[in-house]
């Protein structure tokens, strides 16, 4: 089982793989899970939660223990609704990670705290949110996942969305590379 356990401020890890059913059960209740890819790809792991469980505590956990960039994979249509464009017109990233322009919700101050990043992510899921509700640039990194998900691109972005779908959750996640 590949789970991170935090008890009394002490982090311990158990390095066996979980079943998909165990991962989905954890995701359904907002627990972070780790997804690792193949040695022939990035050979790394990402902490993942379903975006609807983005809380100050979960974002802080990701920043503290994974230490990578906190990203939010979402549907292209959702990001287009908010007028959030691709970060670059020609993507030359080795793995073609589809970054968009970063955002903060207008009700945040600096946008960088775990609480404000969680708030921005929650607002990205809000069906009543409008383009003017988001400032650019910001501290939340939306990503566009490929339609067809892991059958088309074997990235953490797409794997996180597949897990959200299988868990019956919204098609949006929060991922953070473990560095």
Language-model region placement:
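Short, Lys/Arg-enriched N-terminal segments with co-localized hydrophobic residues
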Residues: 1-12
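Catalytic domains of riboflavin
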Residues: 12-179
């Amino acid at each position: 089982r590949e789970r991170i356990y935090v008890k009394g401020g002490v982090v311990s890890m158990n390095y066996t793989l979980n079943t998909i059913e165990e991962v989905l059960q954890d995701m359904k209740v907002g627990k972070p899970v780790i997804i690792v890819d193949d040695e022939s790809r990035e050979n790394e792991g990402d902490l993942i939660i379903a975006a609807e469980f983005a809380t100050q505590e979960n974002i802080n956990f990701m920043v503290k223990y994974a230490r990578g960039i906190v990203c939010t994979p979402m549907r292209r249509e959702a990001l287009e609704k908010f007028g959030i464009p691709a970060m670059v017109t020609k993507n030359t990233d080795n793995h073609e990670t589809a970054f968009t322009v970063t955002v903060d919700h207008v009700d945040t101050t600096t946008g960088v705290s775990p609480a404000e990043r969680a708030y921005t992510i929650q607002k990205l899921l809000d069906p009543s949110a409008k383009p003017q509700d988001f400032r650019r640039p910001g501290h939340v990194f939306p990503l566009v996942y490929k339609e067809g998900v892991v059958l088309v691109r074997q990235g953490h972005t797409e794997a996180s969305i597949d897990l959200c779908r299988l868990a019956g959750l919204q098609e949006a996640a929060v991922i953070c590379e473990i560095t």
